[in-house]
Amino acid sequence: MCSQEGEGYSLLKEYANGFMVSQVLFAACELGVFELLAEALEPLDSAAVSSHLGSSPQGTELLLNTCVSLKLLQADVRGGKAVYANTELASTYLVRGSPRSQRDMLLYAGRTAYVCWRHLAEAVREGRNQYLKAFGIPSEELFSAIYRSEDERLQFMQGLQDVWRLEGATVLAAFDLSPFPLICDLGGGSGALAKACVSLYPGCRAIVFDIPGVVQIAKRHFSASEDERISFHEGDFFKDALPEADLYILARVLHDWTDAKCSHLLQRVYRACRTGGGILVIESLLDTDGRGPLTTLLYSLNMLVQTEGRERTPAEYRALLGPAGFRDVRCRRTGGTYDAVLARK
């Protein structure tokens, strides 16, 4: 009977089971499956994995076999037993320490974003984030959930560092930024984008501006603080004086906030910006009609359940930047996750 239902029914099941796939990925990362197999001298059977992880034999075997089906692990038979090893995909993106690892961002997604997504229907009804239901944190305290402990803050910062390690150079090369000798990355976190900037544009210097707790962690844990071309400045970009610069980068910042708060921040940036300078907004752009790409629409729903903001179309960014005083607004799609919007003072 199922085979007679056609592609529509199969697609529906694929959508409905999508959360299970995500949880397999999150759980395997949380348990340390990929690290264990990366460190092992040879492929391990499920009993050995279970013993090392302190997990149940039955659950471990089920998880490992599901990861094989998802092409995260590969299985061979030795001595009558199945043994498991990481695939290239897992070795590249899911093992801590890999130059291209995305493990920390996946852990954040599983521990924080996924919990909020359980309340998507309520978010749609109410039009606000779901931190109160998910974590008992008032909805206006946006980053209290993400930064609810120093470990969570460090993990989120590491996750963003990993994202920018893969995607930073592409989006920073969307426009030639060499005419801007001093660049200020507002909400710059670990300094990953600043590091990419001075690597791509060696004649530039960069300032990383973020709240004190983030700056202190960045200096302790991330290598950008060791580059003499990069400095750190503590402050709240909504309240405190902004360092003077030729170019301000707002990467994954405006999508957190309402239009009113974005306008307020952009006006502050315009006043601080040197004459002839500019602003680079890095976000995932919606299509002109607002009905795609799918990934950006999902990100926008993520903003609904977690922040005050949303993803926007190029026209909507122009409508924010123009009244703040910026001119010559140009939008460029990179073909990657994040796109670039450059405007001048």
From Swiss-Prot:
The keyword Ion transport does not apply. GO terms for molecular function: acetylserotonin O-methyltransferase activity; protein dimerization activity. It catalyses: N-acetylserotonin + S-adenosyl-L-methionine = melatonin + S-adenosyl-L-homocysteine + H(+). Pfam families: Dimerisation (PF08100), Methyltransf_2 (PF00891). Substrate binds at residues 256, 302, 306. S-adenosyl-L-methionine binds at residues 147, 164, 210, 235-237, 252. The keyword Oxidoreductase does not apply. Pathway: Aromatic compound metabolism; melatonin biosynthesis; melatonin from serotonin: step 1/2. Transmembrane segments: none annotated. Belongs to the class I-like SAM-binding methyltransferase superfamily. Cation-independent O-methyltransferase family. Homodimer. This is Acetylserotonin O-methyltransferase. It comes from Bos taurus.
